[in-house]
Amino acid sequence: MNAAYLQLFEQIWNDASKLQEVTDEVIENITTVYNENSPDYLYFVTLYNIFNEFLEDVSEDVLPNEATGFKESKIWGMLYNFQKDAALAIINKLEKYNGCILADSVGLGKTFTALSVIKYYENRNKSVLVLCPKKLANNWNTYKYNYINNPIAADRMRYDVLFHTDLSRESGNSNGMDLDMVNWGNYDLVVIDESHNFRNGGKISGENEKENRYLKLLNKVIRKGVKTKVLMLSATPVNNRFVDLKNQIALAYEGESQLLDEKLNTHKSIDDIFKQAQTAFNTWRKWEPEARTTS
């Protein structure tokens, strides 16, 4: 048997048609291994090898369309690089998942980042509503009016600004708009400033079974009329329960958890995932401080 294998080896070894010159390839591979590559190069190679399986999920359908000219806008030019990265990521998530939470800390410019996203959708001829607490009215009005203190007046922003409390009103005027005439269901994008105010979810209470603001938002703005994307801004999206976050995320899929389950293609429902996370957190919180690690 050994003699037969040896004869076969000799036959192949002496057959020039079966030989392949690999010297140059071996030298190239060895050289690559021993090259002194920059830290940046090694960093990006590492990122690629970790995340390359997710690249197939990225398509031109969900990437920002630069042909809209939003990168030539005044607001875009005023952003820091980290805000530009955030804006592009937000647009991607709005297109792919229909919703996004921008949860940067106070002072990191969430308003300006959101304005750049609004500009992107306005350039696509989309109708945008900003819902904010009444105390923040001037914060948003400044950037849409032709005021001398408006640094982005050249962008001619045209979004509407209404208040959280307006969701429960049926008449009267608010921020220069007649609430009798507002077409709540005609907004392609709603930006909710301080979205943590909607963390308690939908409830019907009282003898007359009145909807709370959360349900008003779902039924008047998100579920009704055109398909509405939801951008939420909050430095504190979670108070002390994970359900706070779940209720806000639910706004992006019209309160129907199965819609998000289908989009994420998870093995468990989003409701079960949050319940499991809350249980794990409650257990962790009871441990002694020295035992509370993230490992």
Name what the model sees in each region.
Residues 1-105, 112-124, 199-209:
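ATP-dependent helicase/translocase motor core
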Residues 42, 240-247:
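P-loop NTPase catalytic cores that bind/hydrolyze ATP
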Residues 67-78, 111-115, 119-226, 256-295:
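SF2 helicase/translocase NTPase motor core
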Residues 105-106, 194-196, 235-237:
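Conserved Walker B
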